[in-house]
Regions:
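Register position in tetratricopeptide repeats
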Residues: 32, 65, 99, 133, ...
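PAPS-dependent sulfotransferase catalytic domain
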Residues: 302, 307, 314-316, 465, ...
Length: 687
C-alpha cells in the first residue's frame, strides 16, 4: 500500500516537503504496533497540511485498527470522494466496511480498488475473504489467484525466488522473514518461506507456514500442493489426502494432482481408489510411462500379476532406459526375463560415466540384468558370473548415493544392550499403554517376514496392514530431542521417560496407525523389519504387544537382501560386508533382549517354517494368543494387498527353491562370510 500512497498528492504542498514525507513514513511504520501513535502523527501532519491525502489515509487506517469505525468511515469516504483514482483509499474503505459488517459495500469498494490497481495483492486477498464468507467460492478462488499472482510479481519477491532457485536459502529466508513482518498474511510470502524451510530440512517449521498460506488463500494450488507433498512424507497422510482431494476437485483435468492423490491413496491402503485414478489418466493419455509404472505397482500389490506385467512392459516400451520399469518387472520374482529383454536393457546402459541424473536408472538396470542372468543360471551355471557382476555394479552405484556408517549401528546396539536390562524392565512393570492390538514382525528384509505377515493376516482375528513407519517416527522424534541438546544421548532420554509419557506414546502409536486399519479385527500386524532396533521402546510403551522375530539363514538372508534394489531405506544392504555386519549386530541385540526378557520375543526360523509348516504356524498363533485356524495354512489364497518385494511369492504355497539360491554364487561371497564370522556355525541358535 505504501507505493500507492506515494502517488496521492495534496492540493498544496508546503515548502518543507521532505519533513512531511519523513513524518508520513514514520506514521506508517507505527501503524502495525502503535496505531494510536500513528493516528497522533497523522493528525499533526494534517494540522500542518490540511487535507493531505496520505495523512488522511493513515488517519482512517489507524481509526479502523483502533475500532473507531464510524470515524474511520467518515474520513475515508471524504478521501475517496477527493481522490477517486486512489486504489489504496478504496481498499481501506472496503476494509472498514467489512469491519462494520457492511459486506456489500465492502466488496464494492475492494472491487473498485483492484479495478484501479490490478496488482494490488492486499486488496485481492481481502476481497477473497469476503466473497468466500458470502458463499461466492468461484469469485473467492479468482481473487485468491489474482492476489497471489500480484504478490508473486512484485520485484522484491521475484528476486527472492531467484535466490531460492540458486540455493541461497539463508539469504532468501532473511528476505522473506523481513517481508512477512510487514505483510504477515501474504500467501505468496508464506508459501515461499515454507518451501525454503522445507529445503533447509525443517519440516516442522515449513508445515505451519504452508497451512497459513492455504488458510489465507484456499485456491492457492501451489501452496496446497506443496503442503500435501510435505505432509505425505510424515505421519499426516490423512491431511495430505484431504488437500490432494481438494486440488483435484478444483482442477479435475490436472494430471499432477491426480497422481498425487493416487499416491496418497496407496499410502493408506486404498489400492482400488488409486487404480481407478491411474486408469482414468491413461484413458486420456496412454503415452505416460510414469503412470504405467505406478499402475503396475498397484496391480502387483493387489495380486493382479498379469496386469502388472503388462503395465511394466508398457512403461519400458515407452521409455526403454527407465531402470525402475525393468527392475519392477524383474522384481516380480515369479517372472523370468527373456533374452530379448536382456538385449534391450544392455542397450539402455550408458557407454560412459554415469551422471547423477541417471544413476538410479542405471543401478536398477544392473539389478534387473542381475536377476535375468540369475534366472538363466538355473539351466546355465556360467550365467551366474554375469548375474553377480551386474548385481555388484548395481550395488556399488547405489551404495555411492547413500550415507551409511556401520559404526553408528554398532553404537546404537551397544547402547540398547546396556540400557535394556532385566532391572530396567522390572522397574517399569505396568507402564505404557496396555493395549494388545499390535503384532510387530521384525528382522531383516528378505528373512521371511512377509510370509509370517501373510500367515497371520489369514486369521479371522488379525488384520494385515503394511510396513508402518510409525514406531520409527516416534523413535526419530525422541532422537530429535537428543539432537537439540535436551539429553546427552537416547538411552538417557528413554531412562527418563515416566509412566504417563510411556502410556501417551503407546496411545499415539495406536492413533497414528488407525488410518491403516480397514476392518474391525482386534489385532493387526505391523511388519516393519527394522523395528528390531526399537524392541526396547516397543516394550516400554506397548508392553502387551506381540513381537515376532523372523529370521533366515545369514547367507540366504544377506545375499537375498544384497541383490534387492529397495525403493527406500535399507542403506546397509548394498555392500556384502556391511549387510553381514548389520545382520551380526541385529543378532547380537536380539540375543541380549532375549536375556533381559526371556520369552518376550517369538522367533520364527524360515527354514523350520518351510520344513514343518503346520507345527510352526501353530507355535506362531500360540505366541500371538489366538486359536489355530486352517486358513493360516492356505495363506496364499488371501487376496489382501501386499506391497513388499515378496508380494508374488506369498501368493503361492511355501516352496523350497529359495533356501539355497546363494550356493550358485558362493564363489564370490567371501566378504559376506568374513563379516558374519561365527554366526554361520551357530545358526539357528539365537546367540
Amino acid at each position: 500500500m505504501a507505493n500507492e500512497l506515494a502517488r496521492m498528492r495534496p492540493a498544496a504542498v508546503p515548502p518543507a516537503t521532505g519533513s512531511v514525507d519523513q513524518a508520513l513514513a514514520h506514521a506508517a511504520r507505527l501503524m502495525a504496533r502503535q496505531p494510536a501513535a500513528a493516528l497522533a502523527q497523522a493528525r499533526e501532519i494534517l494540522h500542518a497540511v490540511p487535507g493531505h491525502p496520505h495523512a488522511l489515509l493513515i488517519e482512517g487506517q489507524a481509526l479502523r485498527m483502533l475500532g473507531r469505525l464510524d470515524e474511520a468511515c467518515a474520513v475515508l469516504r471524504g478521501l475517496v470522494a477527493s481522490q477517486p483514482r486512489a486504489a489504496a483509499a478504496a481498499a481501506e474503505l472496503g476494509l472498514t466496511m467489512a469491519a462494520m459488517d457492511r459486506s456489500e459495500e465492502a466488496v464494492a469498494e475492494l472491487r473498485r480498488a483492484v479495478l484501479l490497481k490490478p496488482e494490488f495483492s492486499h486488496a485481492w486477498q481481502a476481497l477473497a475473504v469476503l466473497l468466500r464468507a458470502k458463499g461466492d467460492n468461484a469469485g473467492a478462488a479468482h481473487a485468491d489467484i489474482a492476489g497471489v499472482d500480484a504478490s508473486s510479481r512484485e520485484p522484491a519477491l521475484l528476486r527472492t525466488a531467484v535466490a531460492v532457485r540458486e540455493g541461497r536459502l539463508d539469504e532468501a529466508e532473511a528476505q522473506l522473514r523481513a517481508r512477512l513482518a510487514a505483510l504477515p498474511a501474504d500467501p505468496a510470502t508464506l508459501r515461499l518461506l515454507g518451501e525454503v524451510r522445507w529445503r533447509q530440512g525443517d519440516i516442522g517449521d515449513a508445515v505451519p507456514l504452508l497451512r497459513a498460506a492455504v488458510a489465507r488463500a484456499p485456491a492457492f494450488a501451489a501452496a496446497r500442493e506443496l503442503l500435501a507433498r510435505i505432509l505425505s512424507m510424515g505421519p499426516d497422510v490423512g491431511e495430505a489426502l484431504d488437500h490432494a482431494s481438494r486440488l483435484l476437485a478444483d482442477d479435475p483435468e490436472n494430471g499432477g494432482h491426480a497422481m498425487l492423490k493416487a499416491s496418497l491413496l496407496v499410502r493408506i491402503g486404498d489400492q482400488k481408489g488409486a487404480l481407478a485414478i491411474y486408469r482414468s489418466i491413461l484413458e486420456r493419455d496412454p503415452g505416460r510411462p510414469r503412470v504405467w509404472l505406478n499402475l503396475g505397482h498397484v496391480e502387483k500389490t493387489i495380486g493382479n500379476q498379469a496386469a502388472a506385467i503388462e503395465a511394466y512392459r508398457r512403461a519400458a516400451a515407452l521409455d526403454p532406459a527407465n531402470g525402475e520399469a525393468w527392475w519392477s518387472l524383474a522384481n516380480l520374482k515369479t517372472v523370468k526375463l527373456e533374452r530379448a529383454d536382456i538385449a534391450a536393457m544392455r542397450a539402455a546402459l550408458p557407454h560412459d560415466a554415469v551422471g547423477d541424473d541417471r544413476a538410479e536408472d542405471v543401478a536398477q538396470l544392473h539389478f534387473a540384468l542381475g536377476k535375468a542372468y540369475e534366472d538363466l543360471s538355473r539351466d546355465d551355471p556360467s550365467a551366474a558370473e554375469s548375474a553377480f557382476a551386474h548385481y555388484a555394479r548395481g550395488n556399488a552405484l547405489r551404495r555411492s548415493m547413500l550415507d551409511y556408517d556401520p559404526a553408528r549401528t554398532d553404537s546404537a546396539v551397544d547402547q540398547n544392550i546396556a540400557l535394556f536390562t532385566p532391572e530396567f524392565f522390572e522397574a517399569r512393570a505396568g507402564w505404557g499403554c496396555q493395549a494388545a492390538d499390535p503384532i510387530f514382525v521384525v528382522g531383516l528384509p528378505r528373512s521371511g517376514s512377509t510370509l509370517v505377515e501373510q500367515i497371520l493376516a489369514s486369521h479371522s482375528q488379525i488384520e494385515g496392514t503394511m510396513e508402518l513407519p510409525d514406531m520409527m517416527l516416534i523413535a526419530d522424534r525422541l532422537q530429535a530431542r537428543v539432537d537439540e541438546g535436551e539429553f546427552p544421548d537416547l538411552p538417557s532420554l528413554l531412562a527418563a521417560l515416566g509412566p504417563d509419557e510411556c502410556r501417551r506414546l503407546g496411545e499415539e502409536y495406536l492413533e497414528r496407525t488407525r488410518v491403516h486399519r480397514k476392518t474391525d479385527r482386534p489385532r493387526f500386524v505391523d511388519k516393519m523389519p527394522n523395528n528390531w532396533q526399537h524392541v526396547g521402546l516397543i516394550r516400554m510403551i506397548l508392553p502387551n504387544a506381540t513381537v515376532i522375530d523372523a529370521r533366515r539363514h545369514p547367507l540366504g538372508c544377506c545375499f537375498s537382501g544384497w541383490k534387492q534394489y529397495f525403493a527406500r531405506g535399507q542403506v546397509f544392504s548394498y555392500d556384502l560386508s556391511e549387510i553381514g555386519h548389520y545382520y551380526a549386530a541385529y543378532v547380537r541385540q536380539m540375543a541380549a533382549f532375549d536375556s533381559a526378557l526371556p520369552g518376550a520375543v517369538h522367533r520364527v526360523i524360515y527354514e523350520e517354517m518351510v520344513a514343518d509348516t503346520l507345527g510352526q504356524v501353530r507355535a506362531l498363533l500360540d505366541a500371538v494368543g489366538v486359536p489355530f485356524e486352517e486358513n493360516c495354512l492356505a495363506f496364499w489364497r488371501n487376496r489382501r494387498a501386499v506391497r513388499t518385494a515378496s508380494s508374488e511369492q506369498v501368493r503361492q504355497p511355501i516352496y523350497t527353491d529359495a533356501l539355497e539360491q546363494w550356493k550358485r554364487f558362493e564363489l564370490w561371497l567371501g566378504p559376506l562370510r568374513a563379516a558374519l564370522g561365527p554366526l554361520l556355525e551357530r545358526y539357528p541358535e539365537p546367540v
